[in-house]
Amino acid sequence: MDRQTALACAGAVAALLVSGVAVGADVAAGRAKALMCQACHGMDGLSKVPEAPSIAGQTESYLAAQLQAFRAGTRKNETMNVVTSTLSDADVANLAAYFSAIEIKVVKVPGE
């Protein structure tokens, strides 16, 4: 590998690390794991209960950080602290990849 190619590869890896994108996250595995999320967040990432936020289309790095914080107990929510306690690092990455990959459409309601 020549110097220019090596520098380009190093730059690409650095950009991925800085962006917080989980390299190798599996959207399909995230969808399978999301079955445990559907009662509150829905399989489409759109909230089913007032207490749960809609998470569809949120950035992958944000979702992963929040799941990690709930799992570590640094972010407090009784339900989420319990639900995330059994998640592996791969589960967190996969769930974040799945919910961030959901495309949402914003529609303006007439009269608003």
At which residue positions do the language-model features occur?
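Bacterial N-terminal signal peptides that target proteins for export
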Residues: 1-10
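Cleavable N-terminal signal peptides
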Residues: 11-12, 22-23
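N-terminal signal peptide c-region/cleavage motif recognized by signal peptidases
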Residues: 18-20
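A structural feature that tracks compact, well-ordered secondary-structure segments
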Residues: 51-54, 64-71, 81-85
